[in-house]
Structures are given as structure tokens and as C-alpha cells.
């Protein structure tokens, strides 16, 4: 496989550059990437340390840096080394400016990240953690989204992923022969989504979980008939209330969350008309 070095340089968490890099790398199955993360680069001293690393290990540079002087220093350095230096959002900003006729602001303040959206995300993450696995059901009215499904159908990581996108998500497990919370009998405004999975796949996941925890005596947890009934019952609950159901058998966490967000915003736009 072809080895490819990518340096991710950012004045924040490098997540934007990382997402862009991974999206692009998905198009190259024969590439073995090595990603170097250089977050919180906000002054020349820190940038010079990174430049020495880049000089030692040449590779493509992806960056998200607000400070104009730091950008100039980085791009000039890469130009002299004859290595690609790509602004992840630079082209987008330029096109927005050209299309709107609004001049790009020269002075940037790092406090731009700490706006309402930033704090909404923090609150959503806190909410997802506190309302994981059926906890604090008395606060479901504060949720944007409620996920229900059998154990190990990726409810928790999906809730957290939604939280990183500013949406408060609670998740409630469905366990065979156990009473389900009575919220399902009430008229609620929140979007409720059922997560189900192929029973055989779910058994594999649960067996791996039990092996990891070194638990041997929990036959019902991996019994095919019970697992199948759990998934069927979740479908039944959702069908009766016209709640959407997503089969996560072949979906990644990101794909599941993206589909949920699409449903959520379509629903929200419909009600806001």
C-alpha cells in the first residue's frame, strides 16, 4: 500500500481538518495514511515547532487557522518545501465573500468559537451523558430526540454524536419482558426513533461484549428468539405510534446519526412552515 503522511494543523481541535482528511481518504483504498495532529496552534512559537516536524516528515498539510500572519507563515514554508498546503475552509470563505459581496474580516477573535452554538453543544453533551440508558426519564421533555432500542444497538454513541451536533438526545433500552417506560403512552413533541439490528449481528456484538467483561452466565442476552423478539417489539411500538425505525445492521454511527438529523430537521421545517 502507498503510504501518505498528512499533517493536520489547527488553531482549535483539528476536528474539521480531520473530518475533511478522512472523507478524502475514503476515496483511496490503496493508501495507508499517517495523520499527525497539531491542535491549538495560536502563536508563531507553536507554529515554528510544527514546521520543524513537517520539515522532518514531509506530507500534505491541511489547516484551519484564523490568524492571517500564521497562515502566511505556514503556506510560505510549505511552498518552499514544495509540499501541498490546503486550507480546509479557505475556498468556502472566499466563495461566500464573492457571492455575497461582503468583505472578509481581517481581524479575527478566537472568542468566535464560544458563541451560542458552542454552549448549546456543551449542554447537549451533558444532557446525553445524564440521560443515557434510560436515566432521568422525568426530564425527557427537554430532549430534542429520544432513541429506543434493544441493548447494543449503538444508542449511546449515536446520542453522543447527535450531541456534538447540538441536539439533546436521550436513549432508552428495550429489554424483553421488562415494562417499558410509560412515556410511550403520552403525546410527546420530541422525535422518537427506534433502532433495530439483524438478530444474528446483534448476538455477535453481545457475545463479544460478554467475553470482554468475562461474563458467562447470561443466556437470555444472546438467545436468538429473545433477541429477535426485542427487535420485533421495538418495531411494533414504533409502528403503532408512527415513529421512524432505523436498521443499524450495516450503518456506521455517523450514518445513523446523519439519517436521524435529516428526519429531525425535515420534521422541524415542516412544523415551522
Swiss-Prot record:
Q: Determine if Kinase is one of this entry's keywords.
A: yes
Cystine crosslinks: none
Q: Which GO terms describe its molecular function?
A: ADP binding; ATP binding; phosphotransferase activity, phosphate group as acceptor; protein serine/threonine kinase activity
Which reaction(s) does the protein catalyse, per the Swiss-Prot or TrEMBL entry? N(tele)-phospho-L-histidyl/L-threonyl-[pyruvate, phosphate dikinase] + ADP = N(tele)-phospho-L-histidyl/O-phospho-L-threonyl-[pyruvate, phosphate dikinase] + AMP + H(+); N(tele)-phospho-L-histidyl/O-phospho-L-threonyl-[pyruvate, phosphate dikinase] + phosphate + H(+) = N(tele)-phospho-L-histidyl/L-threonyl-[pyruvate, phosphate dikinase] + diphosphate
User: Per the record's keyword annotation, is Iron included, yes or no?
Assistant: no
The positions annotated for binding ADP are: 149-156
Keyword field: Kinase, Nucleotide-binding, Serine/threonine-protein kinase, Transferase
Q: Which domain of life is it from?
A: Bacteria
Q: What is its EC number?
A: 2.7.11.32, 2.7.4.27
Matches recorded under NCBIfam families: PRK05339.1 (NF003742)
Task: Tell me its family.
Answer: Belongs to the pyruvate, phosphate/water dikinase regulatory protein family. PDRP subfamily.
* PANTHER family in the record: PYRUVATE, PHOSPHATE DIKINASE REGULATORY PROTEIN 1, CHLOROPLASTIC (PTHR31756:SF3)
Q: What does this protein do?
A: Bifunctional serine/threonine kinase and phosphorylase involved in the regulation of the pyruvate, phosphate dikinase (PPDK) by catalyzing its phosphorylation/dephosphorylation.
The name on file for this protein is Putative pyruvate, phosphate dikinase regulatory protein
Give the organism, scientific name. Answer: Rickettsia rickettsii (strain Sheila Smith)
Amino acid at each position: 500500500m502507498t503510504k501518505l503522511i498528512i499533517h493536520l494543523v489547527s488553531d482549535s481541535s483539528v476536528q474539521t481538518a480531520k473530518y475533511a482528511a478522512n472523507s478524502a481518504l475514503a476515496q483511496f483504498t490503496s493508501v495507508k495514511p499517517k495523520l499527525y495532529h497539531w491542535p491549538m496552534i495560536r502563536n508563531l512559537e507553536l507554529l515554528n515547532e510544527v514546521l520543524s516536524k513537517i520539515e522532518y516528515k514531509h506530507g500534505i498539510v491541511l489547516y484551519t487557522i484564523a490568524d492571517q500572519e500564521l497562515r502566511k507563515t505556514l503556506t510560505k514554508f510549505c511552498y518552499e518545501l514544495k509540499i501541498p498546503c490546503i486550507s480546509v475552509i479557505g475556498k468556502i470563505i472566499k466563495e461566500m465573500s464573492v457571492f455575497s459581496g461582503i468583505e472578509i474580516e481581517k481581524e479575527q477573535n478566537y472568542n468566535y468559537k464560544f458563541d451560542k452554538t458552542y454552549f448549546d453543544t456543551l449542554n447537549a453533551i451533558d444532557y446525553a451523558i445524564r440521560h443515557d440508558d434510560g436515566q432521568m426519564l422525568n426530564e425527557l421533555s427537554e430532549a430534542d430526540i429520544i432513541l429506543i432500542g434493544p441493548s447494543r444497538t449503538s444508542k449511546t454513541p449515536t446520542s453522543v454524536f447527535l450531541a456534538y451536533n447540538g441536539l439533546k438526545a436521550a436513549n432508552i433500552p428495550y429489554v424483553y419482558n421488562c415494562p417499558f417506560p410509560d412515556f410511550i403512552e403520552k403525546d410527546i413533541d420530541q422525535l422518537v426513533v427506534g433502532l433495530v439490528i439483524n438478530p444474528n449481528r446483534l448476538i455477535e456484538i453481545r457475545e463479544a461484549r460478554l467475553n470482554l467483561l468475562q461474563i458467562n452466565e447470561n443466556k437470555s442476552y444472546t438467545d436468538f428468539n429473545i433477541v429477535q423478539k426485542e427487535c420485533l417489539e421495538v418495531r411494533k411500538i414504533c409502528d403503532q405510534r408512527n415513529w421512524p425505525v432505523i436498521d443499524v445492521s450495516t450503518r456506521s454511527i455517523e450514518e445513523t446519526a446523519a439519517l436521524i438529523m435529516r428526519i429531525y430537521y425535515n420534521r422541524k421545517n415542516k412544523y415551522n412552515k
